[in-house]
């Protein structure tokens, strides 16, 4: 099988040296992602496209899906590469490829040509289009908005029959811009803002301020791992968890009610800036949107920014909540965000929307900054790829099995889309579908006399969810890894 990767248009308008660097980085990213599926595949870069060739036909859909999620790719063409002799030969090959698709449909032919030939692209379009129209009686030519567009590419003596076109996510390849640290909470905003910076070519590390114990951290780890695995797995990134409960306790005890929200955000920015400086990261990323909550007015945002020299990026600053939720739905984080535990440890009864710098600084003089230094020093930093391994250690009490007994039921916790694409069928045992984001509310409705074997494709989500259910008091869960 063969795929032609078309570059994001903004890459093609760069200078020659920058364009070549971007293409080289994108080629490396594609190799890093796809080597997990087929170690024998070849990735070859050209001036205006990248070729991916693989032998394992069983991995075709998986490879195609992975390519649509790599930043820097505008679209992917799945092609059949064949030699040709003349225009009539092109027509005959197109007829074999497209006959079934064109039955009863309107169509047009679009051709791109590279190399020296005694015909033009328009000549091929007319010849092939006329031939298809004559040989498929129920088909009809329509040049604007046809039901089917027959895409052909001619390069020297090779014909590329386009079997399918699939849109990528665009943007710049990860690694073409500098690293950033995303302040991730697991909600709608921070997930979308992290994705937007990945799409713009940044390697995104994650910093999580834990206000709610193990269950909260498990949920946020799931979101961070999902974002990395889906859009940024070409690079290693860090997941830094900071236990912020001592800081919250100090704020609740010593800070005036109306100033709590702004001061908490200032403490988070101070802590994140220290982490960023430690690892050489150039900027922080937050999901703040103008006016969404009291701490996100221009006055308050300016005061929050003042505590650090580190650049703070807010890609969602002008977005409304509906737009953010729609983006979360597109990238697959909506269900995580909807079921994420809410921990509002610092809730002011009358939060200020226009904080005064002198008052904020006066309140912060009451704060013991050694507490902040200590929680940053004790921050837990892991390679995001180790989240799965670390979860294995944490869920020692949850048994992992590769077989099943008479009282066992497999619980497929993948998302609905994944279940529809690859239904799970295991001979000799019932399989029940319950997406991971419904476990917290629906698992208790299942037959608790059964032993439930949680399963997902890579085993990360099933382990995290097993730990979560154990914490909720459900002891009839195991992890299924055949």
Curated annotation (Swiss-Prot):
It comes from the Bacteria. One of its GO terms (molecular function) is ATP binding. Coiled coil: none annotated. One of its GO terms (cellular component) is cytosol. ATP binds at residues 183-184, 265, 287, 296. The active site is at residue 456. SUPFAM superfamilies: Adenine nucleotide alpha hydrolases-like (SSF52402), Rhodanese/Cell cycle control phosphatase (SSF52821), THUMP domain-like (SSF143437). One of its GO terms (biological process) is thiamine biosynthetic process. Keywords: ATP-binding, Cytoplasm, Disulfide bond, Nucleotide-binding, Redox-active center, RNA-binding, Thiamine biosynthesis, Transferase, tRNA-binding. The keyword Glycoprotein does not apply. Disulfide bonds join 344-456. SMART domains: THUMP. The keyword Cell membrane does not apply. Residues 404-482 form the Rhodanese domain. It is found in: Cytoplasm. Belongs to the ThiI family. HAMAP family: ThiI. This is tRNA sulfurtransferase. It comes from Shigella flexneri. The gene is thiI.
